[in-house]
From Swiss-Prot:
Known partners and oligomeric status: Part of the 50S ribosomal subunit.
Summary of the function given for this chain in its UniProt record: Binds 23S rRNA and is also seen to make contacts with the A and possibly P site tRNAs.
Name used for this protein in its record: Large ribosomal subunit protein uL16
Biological processes annotated in GO: translation
Gene name, Swiss-Prot/TrEMBL: rplP
MF (Gene Ontology): rRNA binding; structural constituent of ribosome; tRNA binding
């Protein structure tokens, strides 16, 4: 699972989900990518589940890149606890994904295999996404 080794502050404010992604909007490593169309918090478990779904479908053929990292803690108070008494303890680590962000990339496989693997991964994620292809001008 993806978890930060060390953080300066154990609890953080919730990151805003409005607006478009400013960086990481093009396919930069692989040939195909999954691009988010809606904003969402993607947890480390969802990222790992999507990665496993893709790699199992691709088998040994290609390479998968993960372009997001869950670096924000989300807290939760215990069940049946009265309001007040401070902020709850960290429960999950999330990546704040904005529309336009490329989440995963794949290379080394045919387009049909890549599209099928990525559609399986999209079903594991809590957002709407599309599959994009690398353009000639991209670095």
């Amino acid at each position: 699972m993806l978890i930060p080794r060390r953080v300066k502050h154990r609890k953080q404010h919730h990151p805003g989900r409005s607006g478009q992604a400013t960086g990481g909007t093009k396919v930069s490593f692989g040939e195909f990518g999954i691009q988010a169309l809606t904003p969402a918090y993607v947890t480390n478990r969802q990222i790992e589940s999507a990665r496993i779904a893709m790699t199992r479908h691709i088998k040994r053929g290609g390479k998968v890149w993960i372009n997001i990292y869950p670096d924000r803690p989300l807290t939760k108070k215990p069940a049946e606890t009265r309001m007040g008494s401070g902020k709850g303890s960290p429960e999950w680590w999330v990546a704040n994904v904005k529309p336009g962000r490329v989440l995963f990339e794949v290379s080394g496989v045919s387009e049909d295999l890549a599209r099928e693997a990525m559609s399986r991964a999209i079903h594991k994620l809590p957002l709407k996404a599309r599959i994009i292809k690398r353009e000639e001008g991209d670095a």
